Amino acid sequence: MRLRNGTVATALVFITTFLSLSWYTAWQNGKEKLMAYQREFHALKERLRIAEHRTLQRSSELHAILDHFRRMIKEANGSRDAFSHFSDETQKLIKDLTNRKALQVPNIYYHMPHLLNHDGSLQPAVQVGLGRTGVSVVMGIPTVKRKVKSYLKETLHSLIDKLSPEEKLDCVIIVFIGETDLEYVQSVVANLEKEFATEIGSGLVEVISPPATYYPDLNNLKETFGDSKERVRWRTKQNLDYCFLMMYAQRKGIYYIQLEDDIVAKQNYFSTIKNFALQLSSEDWMILEFSQLGFIGKMFQAPDITLIVEFILMFYKEKPIDWLLDHILWVKVCNPEKDAKHCDRQKSNLRIRFRPSLFQHVGLHSSLAGKIQKLTDKDFLKPLLHKIHVNPPAEVSTSLKVYQGHTLEKTYLGEDFFWAITPVAGDYILFKFDKPVNIERYLFRSGNPDHPGDQLWNTTVDVLPYRKDIVELRSDTKENRLPDGFFRIGKFEDGLAEGTVNSNLNPISAFRLSVLHNSAVWIILNEIHIKRNPAD
């Protein structure tokens, strides 16, 4: 009997292990396939961008030829003798071409005309590394000469030492030396080659620097926003450094993340970044933020870099990089006829913040001479007491009294948890979508590790369909219709409410959590996930 029981137990362990391995393998294969599809998609978009760029180049060359013909005709003063040796057909063609007044399309040379004076102004003057491509994440680290202390080696060690062997094959770290003094650049390269010989030799690390001809004259810039002449020059050059680095990095991977040369990274930062991006693969985001400070930890999709660089180059003399990034979002989604709150909601769908922060600023001495910079990211060491999801744009409201700034708006955006004082019957939490949305699933989780008892009880989940004349409903669904037009589709059990939305109720105008009875405890809502239908 013991032998038989032991055999059964062994068989169960074997089957459980086999099923677990099968599930994990399928899950891992699914992730890898998604990354492969993303690579193919981004490669296709990149080829399209290159084709468009070449078309613009050919168009510019044609305009140059036509301008040459126009000058020839003007110099000939319309004399027939000047073109008498051409056939009638050729003369007619020249006349037709020179009479065309096509509009010129602005490009990088319009904003930086000095680049036309030298060949190779957009090619690195120094380039060290294997030129690795086809990775998931490209990390860009700009560095310049600091008078007091350089943090570059410590930054690179922090990033590299926290990568697994597999992760080291799926990324590339680009160090951009923003100096034109070749002697200094070569000294930095020599130090990096000595310290990181293995990483450079494997293709993990690359080092580049721009040619002196890439930079315009930075000595006669207009002073704006109360900044000194030196600070205006510093921030203007910084914008140009970012642009060169991003243009170089764009074709190397699926995502590009901007870092600085004076940071430290959290353990498992790479897998966290990659998995978070994969979760949002179906969302229309533009910036993922993995730090709240400046330009640190801002990640972009490779195809979006073209727009970002073009926008920065249009205004590189006017404002710092973080302001310009916010302006891009404003231009894309903000309606001048709406208020600032509506604008912030729209921008939050393009600019998604991950918490806690994955990178911490450690540099005390800024690259701007004489500036002491005591900036630290307060979210870096915080435990995560809420979960982050991207929800449909909505106006949120509640009858509950909020505690210590833990607002519903922040929770909906994935920035914090919602904390409110004791609910009573009739209290509600309302999510009114900016436009009707087809919803597949929902999840609301209350309580958190610090306050596990602060849960929602006796609370229902209601939805308001956009269509008022719904007839394609089962009788049990119709019975859940409330007098105000909402439909009751779920309730909280053990602090959790989750489920699907009947497809016949879609599209949905609003979600509501309704408190049915007085509660004896405060409530925390730490996770909100209203998942769109993927086909929406």
From Swiss-Prot:
Keywords: Coiled coil, Glycoprotein, Glycosyltransferase, Golgi apparatus, Membrane, Metal-binding, Secreted, Signal-anchor, Transferase, Transmembrane, Transmembrane helix
Coiled coil (residue ranges): 28-54
Cited Pfam families: MGAT4_cons, MGAT4A_C
Topological domains, Cytoplasmic: 1-6
Pathway named in the protein's UniProt entry: Protein modification; protein glycosylation
PANTHER family per record: ALPHA-1,3-MANNOSYL-GLYCOPROTEIN 4-BETA-N-ACETYLGLUCOSAMINYLTRANSFERASE A, N-ACETYLGLUCOSAMINYLTRANSFERASE VI
Family: Belongs to the glycosyltransferase 54 family.
Protein's name in the database: Alpha-1,3-mannosyl-glycoprotein 4-beta-N-acetylglucosaminyltransferase A
Annotated organism of origin: Xenopus laevis
Gene name of this polypeptide: mgat4a
